[in-house]
Every structure is written in C-alpha cells, then in structure tokens.
Amino acid sequence: MVTIRADEISNIIRERIQHYTKKINILNTGTVLQVGDGIVRIYGLDEVMAGELIEFEEGTKGIALNLESKNVGVVLMGDGLRIKEGGSVKATGRIAQVPVGDAYLGRVINALATPIDGRGEILSSEFRLIDSPAPGILSRRSIYEPLQTGLIAIDSMIPIGRGQRELIIGDRQTGKTAVATDTILNQQSKNVICVYVAIGQKASSVAQVVTTLQEKGALQYTIVVAEMADSAATLQYLAPYTGAALAEYFMYKERHTLIIYDDLSKQAQAYRQMSLLLRRPPGREAYPGDVFYLHSRLLERAAKLSSKLGEGSMTALPIVETQSGDVSAYIPTNVISITDGQIFLSADLFNAGLRPAINVGISVSRVGSAAQIKAMKQVASKLKLELAQFAELEAFAQFASDLDQASQNLLARGQRLRELLKQSQSAPLTTAEQIMSIYAGINGYLDSLELGQIGKFLRELSDYLKVNKPRFQEIINSTKTFTEEAEAILKDTIPSEKDRFLLEEKI
C-alpha cells in the first residue's frame, strides 16, 4: 500500500507558492461586425487608440482609423479574405513600425518592409515608426549643399539642395519618372542613399525602373518600396511612410538620402477610397478634409539636420500627375504649397521633342542659388534670363513678318540654348560637362552651328576635354569655382574644336 507523506506534499506546495508570480494578461478585444472592401467594423476594443495596430485571429493586421461611439473602423493591411463576421480581434498596443537597416540596400520591398524580389529574407534588428514626427526647427539648418541631378536644365536653373522638397509635376507620359531615375543614377560615387517609392504603378513599370537601376549599377545604393496598382488601398497609403522611415534611418546616421515618391496623386486616391469606405465626410473632389495633412506630415520629414545631429539630410522629390496640365486642381495645389519649389513638365514640349520636357518659365526652386556651387552660379546666371527673353520674342515672332537683325540673332541664340538643354535618358552629365555646355552657348560659340549639330559637337567637345585637357575637370571638382584658368582652357579649346568639327561635317 502506498503511503502518503504529508510533509513532502506540503513542502512541494510551499515551494510552488514561493515561485508563483502573479501575472495577469489584460487583452483589449473585440468582435468583427462587418467586413468588406478592405474595411472592418469591430464591436468592442473600448480602449483602442487612433492609429493602433489591430490583430485578427487568423493573423491579418489592420490599423484603427475611425473611433466611433458604437464601433471601430479598421483598415486592413492585406486582403483579409479569411476574416469572418463574429471573429475575435485584439488590440496590440503598438503603432505600425517597420524594420530598418543597411541590409535593405539593393532590395525591392513592399509597404510592410517584406522583400518581394525573391532574394530571401532581410535580417534587421532595428525598427522605426512608419509615421515618425518630423525634425523640429532647432533640429534643422538652412540648405547649402547641392544635390546634383545630372540634368543640365535643373542643375543650372532650378537647383536642388540636400534637404529640399522639390515637386516634379506634369501630365502622364511627360517623363516625370525619367527625371527621378536619372537623379538616382547621378548619385553614383556621391555617397547618397536613394529610396524609390512606387505607389499604384503597373508592375511592368516598376520592373523597368529596377532593371535600369541594376544595369547602371545604381541598385546597390537604392531601396525600392513598391505597392502595385492591384495592392490594397491601405498598403498604397502606407508605402510612402515606409520609404520615409527607411530614409530617416540613414539621415539620423549622418548620411545623405534622396527619396522619390512616384506618385502622391495615387496615394491621395487610395486615402480617398479608404476614407469614403469608412464613411468620413467628403470634401473638395471627394477627398477627405485631412488630405493636406496626409502629404504635409510626409514631406515635412525631409530635412537638412543641424550640426548637433550630424548634418545628415533627406531630400524629397515627390511626383504629382496633372490632368491636361491643370496645376490648380486640389492635390497639385496642396503639394505645391508644401514643397520648396516645383519642376513642371509640359506635354507640348515633350511632343515637340524637347526632352526632358521642363518648362523653365514656370518651374522654380525656392532654395535657389544657395544650392549651387560657385562655378555654376558664375556661368548659369544669364541662362534663365536669355531663355525667358527668347520665349517672349519667339511668341512675338509668330505674328511679325520681318524682324531686325538683332532680334533674329537673339532668336538664333535662344534656339541653340534650348537645344543644349536636351538630354537623352539615363545619361546624366557631370558638373564640368554642364558648365562647358552652358559657357559655349552663352558666349555665342554655338551660333554658327546648325541646330542638329549641337548635341554631337558638345559630346565630341566633352570627350576631347576629358582626354586632352583633364585639368578643366580637376579645377571644377577641386575648387568648385570657374577660375580664370578654367575659362582660358575653354576659350582656347572651343574655337579650334569647332573649326575641326565643321571641317569634318563638310567632308
């Protein structure tokens, strides 16, 4: 017969009581009332906070956006096909955040920072809130360093500085993405981390951008965040914030970053869709009342940090699509008022063969010459004025039958200046090449050439200077000034090279 030893049992019970820790898990839970169109109505969740992450029993996550008296409106971060009415839901007590780190460079990810390029998982131990607060006034300093785009029209007349927000605006198929990708290509060897955010684009368009970056060796310093046209509206709305969180990580590590949002019109449309399904009151063009805040809190995160914070920078190039050149629509006017200038791409110029199709007359950079090196200021100061005078005279010349010689000369010069602004895609120019081209145009060296010969002559002149006069590029790169020696090299080289070129063209 088994004997029961009371003292042994009491010892075990005492030991268990000593090691017992009083741990109570309090969960804020709710029940699914209704689900559809990426929106879930939930009963319960009494203590949920606006913007809090919500977890459904089958693993899908969502964000609580509408806190109403009888239910909570949640937007889904996924398709939510397995969510059922009456299902259980719990609040996580966390706000949406994404992993960040150097491991993301060269990868293509979605709005939840999950890789979609088929190259395996990305290991990262650091996290950042998707919706981080922007740096305050004392955390910033004024912009003084140029961010070279490699596009002569922008770098000479609409300069962009590190930490600036410059809007790229224009109709569809006017080369907006091409301007942005060329800017990424030009950051090679400039120690700038690039983030390209594709919102609601065709998968083929994103694949084309990724292929271009890969072929040109630019993907190694670029992160691509992509949510395609078939993605959930919530993910299209979140994608720019995910891109900004990744760029901020590098900015606070004292690095320079460039972020491109392609494009914010589609993000606004996704947000409008979410808001209307949540039954928020519609405003102008059926957008919700806080659509301005949607873009302002995103673009204010771009900054040039103060010396105390390491002088890192985040430059934003948001893209906005217009309908038939209407820049007075709701989203274009909102983003124009938030940014530090805009580059306007014109369908008429694009169709006339001027690529990039930048309308210099109405494009502006509010940072201006503070974002230019001294050499560019010295050479390009006359360029915008001469082009403006030419545009005015060209409009007048359509009605005038006979023009005096001075006006004819001005027209001829203007046509040649406009010709030197033409550039093929994925072929950014160095600062020295831009200065050489502008100097040749402004000082009349191109006046005796036919319009069709200008591009070829400038390419040959650039090749000649690189091989035979490398000192010119050295001066520009080292002193950042257009010195007398640099000018003497151009004065000596351009006429002799032009004579040789014209002779070859005649043969």
From Swiss-Prot:
One of its GO terms (cellular component) is proton-transporting ATP synthase complex. The keyword Methyltransferase does not apply. ATP binds at residues 170-177. Coiled coil: none annotated. It is found in: Plastid membrane. It comes from the Eukaryota. Its EC number is 7.1.2.2. This is ATP synthase subunit alpha, plastid. The lineage of its organism: Eukaryota, Viridiplantae, Streptophyta, Embryophyta, Tracheophyta.
